[in-house]
Every structure is written in C-alpha cells, then in structure tokens.
Amino acid sequence: MRFLTQQTIVIVFTSVFMLSTSLASEHNHDTPPQTDSLLNEGKKWKIDSSLHEGMNRIKHSMQSKVSAIHDKTFEPEQYKALAAEIDMHLTYLFENCKLSKDADAQLHVLLFKVIEGKEQMRASTEQRAGAVTIIKTLQLYPKYFDDKNWQPLQH
C-alpha cells in the first residue's frame, strides 16, 4: 500500500464504500443505504489512538481557517490547499486506524462526509459548502465515538 498515492487511496476507499452501499441496497430493498452513523446499542463506539490523532489533525486544519471560511474571505486556492491537507489526514487514518469491524463501518460513514467536503473544496464551485460539511462532520464525531480527549472545534 506504500506505493499508492494519497489520491488513489481516497478514490479506492470512496469507490469501495459506494459499491458496498449499492450492493447492500440491492439485497435489501426495504432499507435505504446507511448515510448516518449509528450508536453501538446506545453507546459510543470505542476508538484507538490513531483515530483520535487523525480526527484531531483534520480539526486543527479546519480550526485555523474557520474564521476566514465563516467570513467568506477564504480564497479558492486556499480551499484547494486545505483539501490537500485533509487528504493527508485521511491517508493517515486509512493507514493507521484499527477499529472493530462495526466501529470501522460507522467511521466510514463519517469519513465519507469528510471526503465529500474535501472534494467540494477541491472543485471550483461550492468550496465553502465543502468546508461546512467537514465542520459539521467534526461536530458529529464525538456524538458517535468515545473520544474522551476530544475538544470541539471552536468557531
């Protein structure tokens, strides 16, 4: 996996996630594909240190730019640079995070939203909406994952 670029890893992850969601919905036509995270029988999912680290990296990247994003003074090239930063943090998560199968599936729901936001920031339109998607996802993370050291994004 060392030889794959970050972008390739993200594309493969996204494709596998979308395909598995599609295949799951083919087998059960009564249940829509999962787009929201779920709790673990009413409890938050256990994490490992790399999940905390990776999510913290994403949060810190967003934190330093949130005022400019909020004030609509963040420039298109800055969004693209931020998307590249988020890419690096996602790669770290994909390479290092070791969760239980069920917790990992729930994490993928959240990370898919981060990927969507990152891709919007990379595009020439709706860049701010992409950043907002990531900010909202960071706000959801502690609702579903038991990260006792998590500090919320300040904005």
Give the ranges of each region predicted by the language model:
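Bacterial N-terminal signal peptides that target proteins for export
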Residues: 1-11
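Helix-rich interaction surfaces within compact, conserved domain-sized segments
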Residues: 96, 107-155
